[in-house]
């Protein structure tokens, strides 16, 4: 076999022409210290705040402290494989998460990575976790109701779309239950829900997901999970990641509801990161910017004006108190940021009043504008009546010689308290809530035994569904003054029949 010189020269010529001299440049730093989920990196002079940094084994970190000669990096994952001297590369982008309809029905971590074993999330849309809150011009005042399905809330501390309503109470008082009931009640309301579990036990979040699946609520819900076993940086990022997912729907003219469960553990995770980074501690060892930590998150919940799509993002932050102390640092911060609070009490919970809402100090600063007319009219004096009843009940313990008017008020207060009780995972449509509260405030329950109230309410609802479905459908839409006579006549007819049946059974 003979080799011709011209062939060799032509092959060499082709190879030389194909040869490219592109040089890949990357900004590289080196790990000088690692431990407790943080790393100090030397180099990377042009690194941005909150920029994603890549370690050799694929683990990501976030630039948290930009100092004179090094960078404090929080590691978004396990830090066992990161060693001193390792290279760290810039990515040129800040922390961002996938957003869009592809996330609905999924359980993801704080970086938007799936945890439910249903395969990758098919979306090419990403948003940074830290975004500026909408300005004054782009907003509109809250005017549409967001029904929780809970009589005690929708009547006395109503929530509107775009509002921030704090749920606050000791552990074990039913805070998560209220949030989950609200999510379940959004079925058919064109509202995407996001549940963010921060620092919870993995079993607790699994229980919430199971209940949402059983009730069919997972069809319109995203769950963002940062459990107690996750590193503090992931617990810190989780609410911002969930908020970015909700903002996608808000900015596209849709309605979204986000639950942060809970922001006490979020503040603790941030405190841990700050102290490890040697930031100066303040009150209760929290860093000085812990107020801004929550205000910049909750300000992103908004009702957008019509020119900007008229979408909304409603936030239900949860705060856990210690022995009912609402004057601690984090509770007072979040109370001052939000548009009202629902305060849950251990004593009420243990007395069987569930949801265990303390009517006296629970308020909604904007939701009243969003109540439907019927609910506003029937529950107008409810809060005052209950407050007076509580006062009288405390006074009545000292003596039994009460006049008729005081006795009547106590009887009505007891029955009103009874009708506001509601079992977990049983949210009520607003028209049935109006019926129950109308019956309580107009004396239809006064002659019943306390034990009969729940059965009476159940039968009243069944009666209206069977005999007056068209009247029920009109309650949320029409003015109360136009339908009150018909509702009153129907309730009178039911009460008459109920009284006769009760007499026959005796």
UniProtKB/Swiss-Prot annotation:
Membrane topology: Peripheral membrane protein
InterPro entries: ATP_synth_asu-like_sf (IPR023366), ATP_synth_asu_C (IPR000793), ATP_synth_asu_C_sf (IPR038376), ATP_synth_F1_a_nt-bd_dom (IPR033732), ATP_synth_F1_asu (IPR005294), ATPase_a/bsu_AS (IPR020003), ATPase_F1/V1/A1_a/bsu_N (IPR004100), ATPase_F1/V1/A1_a/bsu_N_sf (IPR036121)
Main location: membrane
Gene3D superfamilies per UniProt: 2.40.30.20, ATP synthase alpha/beta chain, C-terminal domain, P-loop containing nucleotide triphosphate hydrolases
Enzyme class: translocase
Function: Produces ATP from ADP in the presence of a proton gradient across the membrane. The alpha chain is a regulatory subunit.
Pfam hit, one: ATP-synt_ab_N
GO CC entries: plasma membrane; proton-transporting ATP synthase complex
EC number(s) reported in the record: 7.1.2.2
CDD domains attached to this UniProt entry: ATP-synt_F1_alpha_C (cd18113), ATP-synt_F1_alpha_N (cd18116), F1-ATPase_alpha_CD (cd01132)
HAMAP family assigned: ATP_synth_alpha_bact (MF_01346)
GO molecular function ontology, one term from the record: ATP binding
Annotated family: Belongs to the ATPase alpha/beta chains family.
Name under which the protein is recorded: ATP synthase subunit alpha
Annotated positions for site Required for activity: 362
Keyword Flavoprotein set for record: no
Subunit structure: F-type ATPases have 2 components, CF(1) - the catalytic core - and CF(0) - the membrane proton channel. CF(1) has five subunits: alpha(3), beta(3), gamma(1), delta(1), epsilon(1). CF(0) has three main subunits: a(1), b(2) and c(9-12). The alpha and beta chains form an alternating ring which encloses part of the gamma chain. CF(1) is attached to CF(0) by a central stalk formed by the gamma and epsilon chains, while a peripheral stalk is formed by the delta and b chains.
Catalysed reaction equations from the record: ATP + H2O + 4 H(+)(in) = ADP + phosphate + 5 H(+)(out)
Domain of life: Bacteria
Alphabetical UniProt keywords: ATP synthesis, ATP-binding, Cell membrane, CF(1), Hydrogen ion transport, Ion transport, Membrane, Nucleotide-binding, Translocase, Transport
Taxonomy of the source species: Bacteria, Bacillati, Bacillota, Clostridia, Eubacteriales
PROSITE patterns for this protein: ATPASE_ALPHA_BETA
Locations listed in the record: Cell membrane
């Amino acid at each position: 076999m003979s080799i011709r010189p011209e062939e060799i020269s032509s092959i060499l010529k082709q190879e030389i022409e194909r040869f490219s001299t592109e040089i890949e440049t990357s900004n590289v730093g080196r790990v000088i210290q690692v431990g407790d989920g943080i790393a100090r990196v030397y180099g990377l002079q042009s690194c941005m705040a909150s920029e994603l940094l890549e370690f050799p084994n694929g683990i990501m970190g976030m630039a948290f402290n930009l100092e004179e000669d090094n960078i404090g990096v929080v590691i978004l994952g396990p830090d066992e494989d990161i060693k001193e001297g390792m290279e760290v590369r810039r990515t040129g982008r800040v922390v961002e998460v996938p957003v869009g309809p592809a996330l609905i029905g999924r359980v993801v971590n704080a970086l938007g990575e799936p945890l439910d074993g249903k395969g990758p999330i098919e979306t090419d849309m990403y948003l940074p976790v830290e975004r500026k809150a909408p300005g004054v011009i782009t907003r509109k005042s809250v005017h549409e109701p967001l029904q929780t399905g809970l009589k005690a809330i929708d009547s006395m501390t109503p929530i509107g779309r775009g509002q921030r309503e704090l749920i606050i109470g000791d552990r074990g008082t039913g805070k998560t239950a209220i949030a989950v009931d609200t999510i379940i009640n959004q079925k058919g309301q064109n509202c995407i829900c996001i549940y963010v579990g921060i620092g919870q036990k993995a079993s607790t979040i699994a229980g919430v997901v199971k209940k949402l699946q059983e009730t069919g609520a997972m069809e319109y819900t995203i769950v963002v999970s940062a459990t107690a076993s996750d590193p503090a940086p992931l617990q810190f990022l989780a609410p911002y990641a969930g908020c970015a997912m909700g903002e996608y729907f808000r900015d596209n003219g849709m309605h979204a509801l986000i639950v942060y469960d809970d922001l006490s553990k979020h503040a603790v995770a941030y405190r841990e990161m700050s102290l490890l980074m040697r930031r100066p501690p303040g009150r209760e060892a929290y860093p000085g910017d812990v107020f801004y930590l929550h205000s910049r998150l909750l300000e992103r919940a908004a009702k957008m004006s019509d020119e900007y799509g008229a979408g909304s993002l409603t936030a239900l932050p949860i705060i856990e108190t210690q022995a009912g102390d609402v004057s601690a640092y984090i509770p007072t911060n979040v109370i001052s940021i939000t548009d009202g609070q629902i305060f849950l009490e251990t004593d009420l919970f243990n007395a069987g009043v569930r949801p265990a809402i303390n009517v006296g100090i629970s308020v909604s600063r904007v939701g009243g504008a969003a109540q439907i007319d019927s609910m506003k009219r029937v529950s107008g004096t409810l809060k005052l009546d209950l407050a007076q009843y509580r006062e009288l009940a405390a006074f009545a313990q000292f003596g039994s010689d009460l006049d008729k008017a005081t006795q009547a008020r106590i009887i009505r207060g007891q029955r009103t308290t009874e009708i506001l009780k509601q079992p977990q995972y049983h949210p009520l449509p607003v028209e049935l809530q109006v019926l129950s509260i109308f019956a309580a405030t107009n004396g239809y329950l006064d002659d019943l035994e306390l034990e009969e109230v729940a059965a009476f309410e159940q039968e009243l609802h069944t009666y209206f569904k069977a005999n007056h479905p068209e009247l029920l459908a009109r309650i949320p839409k029409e003015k109360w003054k136009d339908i009150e006579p018909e509702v009153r006549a129907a309730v009178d007819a039911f009460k008459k029949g109920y009284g006769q049946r009760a007499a026959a059974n005796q």
